[in-house]
Amino acid sequence: MVLVGSPTTSVQGECNRGGEPIPGAVLVAESLGPELYEAIVVSAAVVCARGGRTGHMQSLCRSRGIPVLRVAPAELGSLVGEVTVRLDRESVLLGAAVPAPRAPGPAPARLDEVDSVCVVVADATDVRAVNALSPRVAQVDSYFIREEFACLSAELSPFDALRSGVAGARRYGAALADELCGMLAELLPGQRLVMRLLDLRSDDAAQITTGVPVEGEPNPELGLHGARWLLAEENYPHAFRALRGRLRELVGPAADRVSFAVPFINDRDEFERLRAHLGLGAGTPLGVFVETPAAVHSTAEFCVAGASELFVGTKDLIQFYLAADRGNHLVAATYQTRHPAVLAALRHAVTAGRGGGVPVHVFALGADVEHYVRRLPTRRLMMCTAELRQVALAAAERAAAERAAGERAAGERVAGERVAAGQVAGEPVAAAG
């Protein structure tokens, strides 16, 4: 099953079963976790045996345009040497194969009716790639980075740093600021950067934490992470203040182009307590990530409490509304991005946010963009880098085709006018018959 698609029909490469970063290889792994970050971002494709379409590492692959194919666990052991990943057939062939012609797929979405796009990125490379698109996607006015992805890019271990004491927390915050500055440097005039505060589930944290124990949880998805973890972590405010201070030190007023959003939060009480915990004054912008049913129904209260903007995280929201683990392939058919209950939740969040005068951004997979735009009262979307690139390239191809058609029509019109005037290339037109 294809978990993350690609414009290409097939990908060839040597199998990488060791998890080390090997550029252009096909990464083969039982499942995808943060410990494989460096290997994932340089891979040509990924083959795994577990996981769903919208897991965290799958989202990273979607951002980078790296295809991900899931195969049966029993088949994983046979994948060695050179292989060809056939996305059109949802299979892996041993050895090299003749590249298949590109199969026609659904037309990429159009952004004609979209006013704003917040692009989900993994590091400065993604920002640079989007801003280098030609023609430029004018609707792109912001970029969104998860703190945990910034950590992975900067090779930081947040739990180790935060639990080493106040000094370690401050060093961690300063290092994060350095990473964000690299992204700031890639922004175009009028663009900004939003960082979603740390939302590291215990199972993922255990993979990248070496110096302190990470308590296991029976259900990490519903465990201690997001806003509830931020409230419980006594050293996080020190890191956050160091981050903001270092940004101001490095870029001065341009630090105002960076804002922050709270992940995995339920209600106004959590929001107000977290603002106090972080030492944020009333005038400091702080957004909210709406990704639980409770948060959907608290949207209006978030606005009253001063949330600067709302980001609707459909990937988590869908799994909670439909009780379908987004990382479990056995319930993949139940995980429906267009389910009526999901659309009703999205519509409620957007309407309540707009009623409170707060911008609302809705995350959409590329295949869902037009569906959401037609059915939701929003023109603000969040999209992954690679999917936005496909949309932009398709728009450029359409524009070129329209120009060519216009030029042909103009040429035919001129020729027709000449015929009507009785002259073609300066000679009289012979009468027919």
Give the positions of each predicted feature.
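Long, intrinsically disordered low-complexity tandem-repeat segments
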Residues: 403-430
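Conserved alpha/beta-domain cores
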Residues: 105-401, 432-433
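Short, low-complexity, intrinsically disordered N-terminal peptides in bacterial proteins
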Residues: 1, 428-433
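Acidic, glycine-rich flexible loop/linker segments
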Residues: 2-145, 155
